[in-house]
Amino acid sequence: MFKRLFVANRGEVAARIVRACSELQIETVCGASTADLEANYPYLQQADAVVCIGGSAPSASYLQLEQIVQAAKQTQCSALHPGWGFLAENSLFAALCEQHGITFIGPDAATMDIMALKVPARAAAMAAGLPVVPGSDGILDSPQAAIVVANQVGYPVVLKADAGGGGRGIRRCNNDSEATQAFTDAAREAQSAFGNAALYLEKYIVGGRHIEVQVL
């Protein structure tokens, strides 16, 4: 069991990690942006320690691989939990943690390289003969490309961030006009949250149930 764990995220997921570690008697160190430090959220107060990992924007803090790993090392954390979104599915980040002797709570870098991005994961599923929701064959390079695929599979559709997680970079579209605006909005959000603006498209399943499977 780890003695001290670094929390490389914010908000609800960080609060859950801090709470779970407290129950397991594991010390937590939260990395926080300058804006979150100023807000002094309850989960930051509940953590054993808090360190600044950069500026207010996620790109200057929660997406800074080196800054986060160095903060974890300097606070003597032997493990790091990425939460969801941000760097949770970044294989370079997982590999960097390993290089510095920090246990990354999640899949190893090799597994992530296959499954971290949605489009390659979708391709791997199809190659294995698994059924997938109808949609684009790869990354969409423009709103016009999204509209072409949307009309092929039929509205409603959903635009998704290739590097998505935590519900970010996702937009439902019911017509061509919505798809045009949604493409810009989703790409901007994905770039801000993951440092990757790439999008793909799938048919939106109305009333569908989401079942997540983890293979350990």
What are these regions (language model features)?
Residues M1-L216:
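N-terminal beta-alpha lobe that positions the nucleotide/phosphoryl donor
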